[in-house]
């Protein structure tokens, strides 16, 4: 991909830097949860700098051309005060909101209580429109206690609350063995995880699709980063940056 470029001047030094129209903030860290103030300060300043922790090299990005931001977060509540700023600047956004229910499983100890996260989801949906807040139950984790049936119960509990506040549910199947640090943490915490196989993926997909229809949610269902083809269950492959959705959300701007 070739980025648009622009010049910025810092401490008397002028340099050519990328100036994309669309910003992804961010899959590397939860910017909305932990760095919302910093991000919007940099947006106002017009650029950000990132230093590679391994070689110390600095990379810059300009916000001169920014017209749309895709946010990723488990707690986007700190974005709420900044939504008027985005509107004032003519910058659109949508939010990939990871809203899981592992509260009683010691798998997400650093997140806010589920009830508070659900309320944040609803507030964002009311502010931005339900098409602009995507529900991610990500990843789906199997353990000796968490079965596919229990996962479906967890999804149903949340879906009952928020199906009127979103249009889409995205999910993935946890590949614990592919992530050494995650695997080590699970073992250290005494959590006996289980890996997904194709049969269990198909079982969950079929039942999730049925749940979506039976409950009248009518959500678009999609997987994230999964090679398995689940089209027969009306489940598509998600796009991280969805050009069609961005076009919908900016059609009136």
Regions found by a protein language model. Name each.
Residues 1-107, 114, 118-130:
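Conserved Radical SAM active-site core
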Residues 28-30, 74, 98-102, 138-140, ...:
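Active-site beta-loop-alpha junctions enriched in small/polar residues
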Residues 33, 104-105, 141-145, 177-180, ...:
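Short catalytic/ligand-binding loop motif for oxyanion handling, primarily in non-cytosolic enzymes
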Residues 103-111, 139-149, 187-196:
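Surface-exposed cleft-lining segments at the edges of enzyme active sites
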Residues 116-183, 206-216, 220-223:
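Conserved C-terminal portion of the radical SAM core fold
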Residues 182-191, 232-240:
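Short, surface-exposed, charged loop/turn segments at secondary-structure junctions
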Residues 198-253:
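C-terminal accessory extensions appended to soluble enzyme cores
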């Amino acid at each position: 991909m070739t980025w648009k470029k622009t010049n910025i001047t810092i401490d008397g030094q002028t340099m050519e830097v990328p100036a994309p129209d669309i910003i992804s903030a961010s899959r590397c860290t939860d910017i909305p949860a932990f760095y919302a103030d910093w991000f919007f300060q940099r947006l106002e300043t017009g650029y950000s700098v990132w230093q590679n922790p391994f070689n110390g090299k600095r990379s810059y990005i300009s916000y001169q051309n920014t017209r749309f931001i895709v946010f990723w977060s488990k707690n986007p509540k700190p974005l709420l005060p900044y939504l008027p700023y985005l509107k004032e600047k003519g910058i659109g956004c949508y939010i990939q909101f990871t809203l899981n229910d592992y509260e009683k499983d010691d798998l997400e100890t650093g997140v806010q209580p589920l009830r508070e996260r659900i309320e944040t989801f609803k507030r964002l949906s009311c502010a931005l429109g339900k098409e602009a807040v995507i529900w991610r139950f990500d990843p789906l984790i199997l353990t000796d206690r968490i079965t596919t049936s229990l996962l479906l119960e967890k999804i149903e509990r949340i879906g009952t609350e928020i199906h009127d506040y979103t249009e889409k549910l995205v999910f993935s199947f946890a590949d614990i063995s592919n992530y050494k640090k995650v695997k080590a943490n699970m073992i250290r915490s005494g959590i006996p995880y289980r890996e997904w196989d194709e049969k269990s993926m198909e079982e969950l997909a079929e039942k999730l699709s049925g749940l979506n229809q039976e409950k009248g949610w009518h959500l678009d269902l999609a997987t994230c980063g999964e090679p398995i083809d689940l089209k027969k269950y009306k489940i598509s492959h998600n796009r991280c940056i969805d050009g069609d959705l961005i076009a919908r959300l900016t059609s009136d701007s």
